[in-house]
């Protein structure tokens, strides 16, 4: 009977080792995917900041042009004789 108990114990250890291996593999996959997600988010943030900065510069330029046009229109409205040909 001692032999049967030893085999059962060995089988239980084998099952436990297999389960532990599967758990470690699962955790490894989760860790890798979390790392990939983090790297993507860092890259996304960097790209987004760069694009937003570029758009902000373009918007500032457009705002300055609009202000200049508003001044020209108000000047033309106030003094139409300046633009008469």
Curated annotation (Swiss-Prot):
Q: What is its main location?
A: cytoplasm
Gene Ontology terms, MF aspect = identical protein binding; protein-containing complex binding
* Tissue specificity note: Expressed in roots, root hairs, hypocotyls, cotyledons, stems, leaves, trichomes, and flowers.
Cystines in this chain: none
InterPro entries, alphabetically?
A: BRICK1
- Lineage top rank: taxon: Eukaryota
Report one GO cellular component: plasma membrane
GO BP annotations of the record are: actin filament polymerization; actin nucleation; cell morphogenesis; trichome morphogenesis
Its localization reads:
Cytoplasm, Cytoskeleton
- Locate the coiled-coil region(s) and give their ranges: 45-79
Question: What keywords does the record list, in alphabetical order?
Answer: Coiled coil, Cytoplasm, Cytoskeleton
Q: What does this protein do?
A: Involved in regulation of actin and microtubule organization. Part of a WAVE complex that activates the Arp2/3 complex.
How does the record describe its quaternary structure?
Answer: Binds SCAR1 and/or SCAR2 and/or SCAR3.
The record's comment on protein family reads: Belongs to the BRK1 family.
Q: Report the protein name in the record.
A: Protein BRICK 1
Question: What is this protein's gene name?
Answer: BRK1
């Amino acid at each position: 009977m001692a032999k049967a108990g030893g085999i059962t114990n060995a089988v239980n250890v084998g099952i436990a080792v297999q389960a532990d291996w599967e758990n470690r593999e699962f955790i490894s996959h989760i860790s890798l995917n979390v790392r990939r997600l983090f790297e993507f988010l860092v890259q996304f943030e960097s790209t987004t900041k760069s694009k937003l900065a570029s758009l902000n510069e373009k918007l500032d330029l457009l705002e300055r042009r609009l202000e200049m046009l508003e001044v020209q229109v108000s000047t033309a409205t106030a003094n139409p004789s300046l633009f008469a040909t």
